[in-house]
């Protein structure tokens, strides 16, 4: 018989895949003798079995759960469902990868109308008993039956107003008893007359099902896609004996970190609430006290807490994020996990742990989440603009960085505005997991309620989004879509600015600037460079991009898109003249006017590179992208060229293609208009030779012919390039070497790579187009249906963001092998967007590519991911 349920004492840290992160850590804490409420874990395999059984919990799993409940009853001397002294439990999810806010918790399970009265008598504290019951009704209704939380919040707010009190804790036992009745009425109405469940066993199975179900709720799917978590992992369920932080003034609950999750600074960091349950701190309903205040409130508990927190950090050798409850002066740990942290904090903590002798340099490099380095490059405010800014309020600096944008009040509105290209600040009373897509779309998040460990703070830090939380002075009018702060009223669409590092809120749109990186970043990067074997280049089209990328550690340019150089105002007219010319001579004349511009750009880039390699891709987009499409611009072009408007319109219409991405572009342009390749070759070679003469820098130009699908195609263009390159060398008296290669971006090129390698001296995989051509859908149109594919679990991630290793990856691997059979030592790289995606970088390492190339600000990510790939695949 399969084992679906494990007591905490039966597990250990090595069982993460089976018990989930929370379950294996609770097991490990049990081994360490920590004060934790005992319980058991229903495994991730049980979750998979639930889905395989048509979303039903099999009888075998149910039997094992109730056997474990019997064991808990014996352990606690209480009965589940007893009317006088009931055993109460909490039910929490726990996937193997931490997913903050994605899964749902239920506390006080086991209470019903009769048990609550016995519970009140047994504890001698009716207020506590009815507070626990109304919380359970609210959580169960929300999590299990999906009755919106807002229904209950409105009732609580109305009662507090009626009683003239500010906080839930000011309500009396009778008030809370009345609340419980009102909550049950809400449940009954929402459930079409069905009463709130009174049988504890039914409550428990409903809760376990809800946790399994929540693995596949929309926000969990979005979070998994954003964080590359496979959908088939499933979640475990942890059932734990309840301990109560809401028993009075000697009880409380809190969340704490062993180091600051925003800065990485060593020292306890966190907050707690007296007379509260765990969800109160995380949900941010009341603004909590800093953890250091606990030393004054409960000195013995504080000392014990500090000792145990340090013990946990030493044991797990990482910064810990701990949840704890104090019940009438007795401390319990509810869970611990490696804490989520900002990228600057991750770097600082990793370096400090190396210095403290807890971990090695290799472990430090592997621990940093490569994607998180994006956060380091988030903007700060321009100091001059900031001086002129008007501070309208301040609150908690929950996630660092600076952001300015238009105010929106709901996640859907924020997402819609972002999709229109607007910069968005999401303003909410408090955020919840349902807001995840709006939070992802926002430049910054501002909340009225909640502390440094609220949902908004934790999720924003994880995403690297600026967040200011707990600004209680804000008055939001959700119906009017306005909020008041600092004597000002802001409507939807008005600009505000947030500083997530100081907690200040500013009126208006304050200019931001790029961030600078810290010493710990440099240390980690030095270690990463020591361990990686894969080179990292950048995709850059301007001298500015090149300098930025070199500063961030790029070892060359893997893709210089020459067409981007033509779109500037003084150049676009010349390329348009070339396109509209009807003879080779006229085209050559127009192109010759472009040579100084292209050459000037190449010279500046070669100088910025200081001898690092640069792969220059020849003109790739279809010509229709360069021609004017408005009548006004067409008339101006006609005037400049001495043509009629009708002639210009006819030429523009002639260039129109039904499927331009698979049309007259790439090397096909050079076959029909060899003069374009001639001009570009002259510009590259003259620039390289002149820079070498001026600076003494050794340069070997790498010329890349795009969109090749046939060896003869490449040979045709290569012959044109060689003829001009040799001519320029002769004119300049130079013996400069150069290489001619191709982009592998058509499946046929990968299939015939052995033949293509007879002509190509290097391969660069253009995985954007290779993905389009292999899947048969375009990057521009896929967004219309990919969401449906995620929901149907056909795809788990966007194939344009994360390389499809099964299909597209197979073509890449095949092309590398075939190419190197023909030309041993063939240099192979990747220059699509995938070059900065960590999982794709690891794939590139495994198949033996020489380098990856990505956008300048993703260079540090690729450097770190390449080191991790080398260390993880030793």
UniProtKB/Swiss-Prot annotation:
Q: Which residues bind substrate?
A: 561, 617, 745, 766-769
Q: Where is this region: C-terminal?
A: 534-874
Write one Gene Ontology MF term.
Answer: metal ion binding
For the region Linker 2, what residue ranges are annotated?
499-533
Alphabetically sorted, this entry's keywords are:
ATP-binding, Kinase, Magnesium, Metal-binding, Nucleotide-binding, Phosphoprotein, Transferase
Q: Where is the active site?
A: 455, 831
User: Which residues are listed for Mg(2+) binding in this entry?
Assistant: 745, 769
- Annotated segments matching region N-terminal: 2-340
Cofactor entry: Mg(2+)
EC no.? Answer: 2.7.9.1
Where is the stretch described as Central? 400-498
Effect of changing residue 831 to A: reported as: Lack of phosphotransfer activity
Describe how it is modified after translation. Answer: Phosphorylation of Thr-453 in the dark inactivates the enzyme. Dephosphorylation upon light stimulation reactivates the enzyme.
State the PROSITE patterns in the record. PEP_ENZYMES_2, PEP_ENZYMES_PHOS_SITE
Note what the entry says on domains. Answer: The N-terminal domain contains the ATP/Pi binding site, the central domain the pyrophosphate/phosphate carrier histidine, and the C-terminal domain the pyruvate binding site.
| PANTHER family reported in the protein's UniProt record | PHOSPHOENOLPYRUVATE DIKINASE-RELATED, PYRUVATE, PHOSPHATE DIKINASE 1, CHLOROPLASTIC
Outline the subunit composition: Homodimer.
Tell me the protein's name.
Answer: Pyruvate, phosphate dikinase
Query: What organism is recorded for this protein?
Result: Clostridium symbiosum
Query: What is the phylogenetic placement of the source species in the record?
Result: Bacteria, Bacillati, Bacillota, Clostridia, Lachnospirales
């Amino acid at each position: 018989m399969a084992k679906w349920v494990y007591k905490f004492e039966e597990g250990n840290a090595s069982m993460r895949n089976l018990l989930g992160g929370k379950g294996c850590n609770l097991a490990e804490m049990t081994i360490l003798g920590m004060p934790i409420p005992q319980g058991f874990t229903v495994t991730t395999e049980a979750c998979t079995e639930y889905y395989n059984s048509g979303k039903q919990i099999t009888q075998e799993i149910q039997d094992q759960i109730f056997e474990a409940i019997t064991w808990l009853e014996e352990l606690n001397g209480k009965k589940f469902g007893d009317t006088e002294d009931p055993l109460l439990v909490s039910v929490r999810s726990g996937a193997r990868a931490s997913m903050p806010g994605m899964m749902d918790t239920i506390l006080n399970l086991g209470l019903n109308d009769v048990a609550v009265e016995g519970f009140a008598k047994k504890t001698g504290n009716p207020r506590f008993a009815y507070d626990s019951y109304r919380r359970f009704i609210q959580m169960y209704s929300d999590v299990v039956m999906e009755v919106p939380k807002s229904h209950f919040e409105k009732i609580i707010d109305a009662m507090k107003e009626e009683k003239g009190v500010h906080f839930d804790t000011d309500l009396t036992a009778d008030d809370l008893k009345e609340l419980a009745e009102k909550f049950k009425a809400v449940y009954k109405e929402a459930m079409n007359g069905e009463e709130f469940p009174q049988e504890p066993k039914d409550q428990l199975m409903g809760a376990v099902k809800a946790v399994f179900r929540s693995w596949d709720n929309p926000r969990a799917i979005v979070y998994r896609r954003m964080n590359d978590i496979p959908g088939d992992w499933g979640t475990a369920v942890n059932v734990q004996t309840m301990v109560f932080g809401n028993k009075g003034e000697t009880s409380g609950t809190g969340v704490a970190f062993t180091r600051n999750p925003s800065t990485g600074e060593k020292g306890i960091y966190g907050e707690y609430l007296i007379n509260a349950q765990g969800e109160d701190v995380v949900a941010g309903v009341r603004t909590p006290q800093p953890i250091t205040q606990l030393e004054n409130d409960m000195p013995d508990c504080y000392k014990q807490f500090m000792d145990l927190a340090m013990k946990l950090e030493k044991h797990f050798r990482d910064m810990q994020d701990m949840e704890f409850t104090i019940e009438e002066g007795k401390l319990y740990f509810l869970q611990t996990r490696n804490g989520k942290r900002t990228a600057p904090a991750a770097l600082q903590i990793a370096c400090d742990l190396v210095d403290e002798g807890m971990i090695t340099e290799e472990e430090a490099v592997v621990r940093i989440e490569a994607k998180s380095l994006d956060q380091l490059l988030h903007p700060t405010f321009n100091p001059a603009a900031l001086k002129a800014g008007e501070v309208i309020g301040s609150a908690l600096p929950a996630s660092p960085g600076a952001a300015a944008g238009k105010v929106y009040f709901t996640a859907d509105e924020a997402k819609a505005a972002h999709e229109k290209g607007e910069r968005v600040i999401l303003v909410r009373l408090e955020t919840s997991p349902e807001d995840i897509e709006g939070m992802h779309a926002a430049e910054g998040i501002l909340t009225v309620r909640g502390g440094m460990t609220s949902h908004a703070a934790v999720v924003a830090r994880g995403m690297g989004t600026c967040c200011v939380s707990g600004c209680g002075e804000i008055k939001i009018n959700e119906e009017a879509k306005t909020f008041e702060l600092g004597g000002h009223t802001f409507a939807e669409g008005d600009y505000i600015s947030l500083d997530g590092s100081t907690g200040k809120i500013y009126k208006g749109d304050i200019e931001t600037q790029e961030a600078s990186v810290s010493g710990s970043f440099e240390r980690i990067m030095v270690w990463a460079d020591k361990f990686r074997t894969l080179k990292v280049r950048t995709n850059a089209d301007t001298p500015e991009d090149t300098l930025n990328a070199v500063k961030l550690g790029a070892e060359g340019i893997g893709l210089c898109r020459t067409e981007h150089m033509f779109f500037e105002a003084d150049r676009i007219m010349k390329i348009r003249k070339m396109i509209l010319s009807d003879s080779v001579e006229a085209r050559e004349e127009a192109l010759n006017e472009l040579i100084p511009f292209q050459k000037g750009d190449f010279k500046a880039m070669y100088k910025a590179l200081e001898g690092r390699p640069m792969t220059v891709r020849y003109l790739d987009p279809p010509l229709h992208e360069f021609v004017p499409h408005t009548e006004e611009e067409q008339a101006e072009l006609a005037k400049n060229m001495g043509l009629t408007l009708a002639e210009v319109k006819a030429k523009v219409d002639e260039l129109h293609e039904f499927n331009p991405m698979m049309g007259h572009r790439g090397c096909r342009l050079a076959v029909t208009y060899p003069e374009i390749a001639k001009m570009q070759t002259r510009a590259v070679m003259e620039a390289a030779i002149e820079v070498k003469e001026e600076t003494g820098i050794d340069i070997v130009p790498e010329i890349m012919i795009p969109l090749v699908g046939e060896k003869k195609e490449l040979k045709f263009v290569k012959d044109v390039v060689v003829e001009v390159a040799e001519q320029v060398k002769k004119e300049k008296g130079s013996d400069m070497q150069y290489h001619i290669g191709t982009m592998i971006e058509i499946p046929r090129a990968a299939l015939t790579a052995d033949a293509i390698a007879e002509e190509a001296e290097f391969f660069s995989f253009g995985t954007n187009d290779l993905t389009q051509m292999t899947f048969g859908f375009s990057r521009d149109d896929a967004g219309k249906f990919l969401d449906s594919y995620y929901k149907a679990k056909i795809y788990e991630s966007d194939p344009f963001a994360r390389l499809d290793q099964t299909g597209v990856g197979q073509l890449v691997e095949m092309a590398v092998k075939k190419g190197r059979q023909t030309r041993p030592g063939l240099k192979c790289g990747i220059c699509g967007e995938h070059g900065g995606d960590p999982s794709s970088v690891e794939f590139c390492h495994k198949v033996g590519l020489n380098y990856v190339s990505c956008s300048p600000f993703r260079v540090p990510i690729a450097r770190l991911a390449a080191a991790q790939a080398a260390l993880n695949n030793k």
